[in-house]
A protein has these predicted regions:
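Transmembrane beta-barrel domains of outer membrane proteins
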Residues: 32-34, 79-81, 117-121, 177-181, ...
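Surface-exposed loop and membrane-interface regions of Gram-negative outer-membrane beta-barrel proteins
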Residues: 4-28, 35-84, 97-106, 238, ...
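Transmembrane beta-strands of outer-membrane beta-barrel pores
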Residues: 2-10, 39, 47-53, 94-96, ...
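Short loop/turn motifs that connect adjacent beta-strands in outer-membrane beta-barrel proteins
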Residues: 37-43, 85, 121-135, 181-191, ...
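Predominantly transmembrane beta-strands of Gram-negative outer membrane beta-barrel pores used
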Residues: 30-33, 135
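Outer-membrane beta-barrel pore domains
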Residues: 12-19, 62-65, 206-395
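Transmembrane beta-barrel architecture of outer-membrane proteins
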Residues: 1, 24-28, 70-75, 111-113, ...
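Surface-exposed coil loops of outer-membrane beta-barrel proteins
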Residues: 53-76, 80-178, 201-242, 318-333
Length: 395
C-alpha cells in the first residue's frame, strides 16, 4: 500500500516587521508492508521519505538540485494478538496513545520499544459503557555506551553525574481510555495517561553538535548534516543541553465527543469535539501546562465530500518535550506557542483529497523572563502566518 502528499507551504508567512517569506514545495512517499505470519502473529513495516535528522516529518523539500532523495525505515514491528482483547507490539512502533490530534506527539514520530493494549468490552448497560482500554508503552531513546562519564563528556554537559555510568534515555507511557455509546448517533471517549521520561536531557543533547555525534550517529552508521531538529523547550543556558524543567512527568486528560452527524446534498457531515489538557508534574516552574481544543465537521470518504477543522492549542515551554510533539502547530518550535489552526478538505476522488491549512502562531514567553529560562523563539517575534496546501493520496 502506498500513500503520499504533495505540499506547497509558505512559512513563516509575512510577519509585519521582517517580511521574511519561505515558499517551497514538498512531497512525501510511504510504502507499507503487511503480512500475517500466523493467525495470532503479524508483521508491519513502512519505508518513508524525509530528512534523517528530523523525526517530526516525512516531508521532503523540492531541492538538492537533481540529487535523489533517501528512503528510510519508518516503522517495523511484530504484532502478537493471542485474543481479541490483547495486543502486544515490539519494534519501531507508533506511540501507544497516538491520535493524530497534534497534541502529545507528532503524527510522524515513531519510537523504538514496546506497546501493550488490553481491551475489555461490555454488553449494553445503564452506564452506556462499550469498552475500556488499558494501554502502556516503553520506549528506548538512546544507548550512550559510556562506562564512566568524564568531566569533558557531552553527557556531563547534559547534567549527568560525573563518575557514573551513562544510562539510556527512556519513556514509560501508560493510561486508560473509556468508550461510551449512548445511541446510534452519539458516542464519546474519555481517559487519562502519564508519561514518565528517564534522562530526558539526552533528547535535548541530541539537538546539539556534540550530542548528535554521541547519541545518534553511532546507531545510524552515518554522519548527519546537523543535530536533530525540533527544539523549543526552555533550557538553563542559550542553546544548552539541560532543560529548565528538572523532570518531565506529564499527566494528561482527554475527552472526545462524536456525533454521526447530518446529511446535506448527499454528503455526510459527522461532528467531533476533542478537548485535552496536560501538566508536567515534574516541575513547579511556570509554563508547565498545555491544552488543545478541536472541532471537526465533515469527513472525506468520496468525491465531493468536504471537511472543516479548527484547532486552538497552547503549549508551555516546560510542558511537553518539543522534539517529539507536533511541529505543524509551531514554526521553529514545538512548544512555547499559542496557535489557531484552520483546515479545509475537499474530496477530489475516493482516495485523493485537497487540503488547505492555515496557521496563526504566537510565542508565549521570552528568554530571561524567568530564572534559567532560555527559549529559541521568544515572545517578541511577530505573529507568524503560514498557509499550506497539499494533495493527499493513497492507493
Amino acid at each position: 500500500r502506498f500513500d503520499g502528499i504533495f505540499r506547497s507551504p509558505t512559512e513563516p508567512g509575512d510577519p509585519p516587521v521582517t517580511h521574511v517569506q519561505n515558499a517551497r514545495a514538498r512531497y512525501r512517499f510511504r510504502l507499507n508492508l503487511d503480512t500475517d505470519l500466523y493467525p495470532t502473529l503479524s508483521f508491519h513495516g513502512q519505508l518513508a521519505t524525509g530528512p534523517v535528522n528530523n523525526a517530526l516529518t516525512s516531508d521532503q523539500d523540492f531541492g538538492g538540485i537533481t540529487a535523489k532523495h533517501p528512503f528510510f525505515i519508518s516503522e517495523a514491528w511484530i504484532d502478537y494478538h493471542p485474543t481479541k482483547e490483547v495486543q502486544l507490539q515490539g519494534g519501531r512502533v507508533q506511540a501507544i496513545f497516538a491520535d493524530n490530534s497534534r497534541f502529545l506527539f507528532d503524527d510522524d514520530v515513531r519510537f523504538n520499544g514496546f506497546n501493550e493494549k488490553y481491551v475489555k468490552s461490555f454488553k449494553k448497560n445503564d452506564g452506556y459503557f462499550s469498552s475500556v482500554e488499558f494501554r502502556a508503552g516503553q520506549y528506548i531513546f538512546s544507548n550512550p555506551n559510556v562506562a564512566i562519564i568524564t568531566p569533558g563528556s557531552p553527557l556531563a554537559r547534559a547534567g549527568e553525574v560525573v563518575g557514573t555510568t551513562g544510562r539510556s534515555a527512556n519513556l514509560f507511557h501508560q493510561g486508560v481510555l473509556v468508550n461510551q455509546s449512548f445511541n446510534e448517533k452519539w458516542s464519546d471517549q474519555f481517559g487519562g495517561d502519564v508519561q514518565l521520561y528517564r534522562h530526558p536531557n539526552q533528547i535535548q543533547l541530541a539537538s546539539t553538535a556534540d550530542g548528535v555525534v554521541l547519541l545518534v550517529q553511532p546507531g545510524l552508521g552515518i554522519t548527519l548534516s546537523g543535530p536533530l531538529a525540533g527544539t523549543g523547550n526552555a533550557t538553563t543556558t542559550p542553546g544548552g543541553a539541560i532543560y529548565t524543567a528538572p523532570a518531565f512527568q506529564i499527566g494528561r486528560l482527554t475527552y472526545k465527543l462524536n456525533y454521526s452527524g447530518f446529511q446535506k446534498g448527499g454528503h455526510n457531515f459527522p461532528v467531533t469535539l476533542n478537548l485535552q489538557v496536560a501538566r508536567n508534574f515534574g516541575t513547579g516552574l511556570n509554563e508547565r501546562d498545555a491544552m488543545l481544543a478541536a472541532l471537526q465537521i465533515g469527513k472525506i470518504t468520496k468525491r465531493g465530500d468536504t471537511s472543516f477543522l479548527y484547532v486552538f492549542s497552547i503549549k508551555g515551554a516546560n510542558a511537553l518535550i518539543s522534539q517529539v510533539t507536533d511541529d505543524d502547530l509551531g514554526t521553529g518550535t514545538g512548544v512555547n506557542i499559542r496557535t489557531n489552526h484552520f483546515r479545509f478538505e475537499y474530496g477530489i476522488a475516493k482516495k485523493v483529497t485537497l487540503q488547505s491549512l492555515f496557521f496563526i502562531q504566537n510565542s508565549l514567553r521570552s528568554s530571561g523572563q524567568y530564572p534559567n529560562f532560555f527559549v529559541p523563539v521568544s515572545a517578541f517575534v511577530p505573529t507568524s502566518y503560514r498557509l499550506q496546501q497539499q494533495i493527499v493520496f493513497s492507493f
